[in-house]
Amino acid sequence: MKIYQNQNSKQIIVSKDELNVEGFVELIANTTDAAQEKHVPVYEVRCGKARVSVGSVGHPMSAEHLIEWVMVTTNQGYQVKYLSADGTPEVSFSLSAGEKIEGVYAYCNLHGLWKA
């Protein structure tokens, strides 16, 4: 799965194929020099639910510095949850029978894309 972001609008495109769209650059996970313990998603799957916490140490959530969204990619597609500054960096995703997690991503507004 490839994730692209528009450099001006910050719009995101998710694609299973490589894209060449003007104004969009591919986001590469875990390439920013920042505290991994606050950015790398941690997840567990139980009873058809994937529970995701961003960071082994909770990521701060303020208007200036927050996790904007969390995404899981699976053998059947992907799901995204958007977070807000007044919430916590934790989300849950329901999985279908036979659906397997392939990747878990978190996007920090200051430090970019992170993958478990």
Feature annotation, model-predicted:
Residues 2-7:
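A short beta-strand micro-motif
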Residues 13-49:
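Transition segment at domain starts
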Residues 54-62:
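Short amphipathic, basic-aromatic surface patches that mediate peripheral association
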Residues 66-76:
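Extended low-complexity, serine/threonine- and proline-enriched intrinsically disordered segments
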Residues 76-86:
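Solvent-exposed serine/threonine-rich low-complexity stretches and specific carbohydrate-binding patches
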Residues 89-93:
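Short strand-edge motifs at loop-to-beta-strand transitions and within beta-strands
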Residues 95-100:
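Surface-exposed, short loops/turns at beta-strand junctions within beta-sandwich domains
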Residues 109-116:
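Short acidic/polar inter-strand loop motif in beta-rich domains
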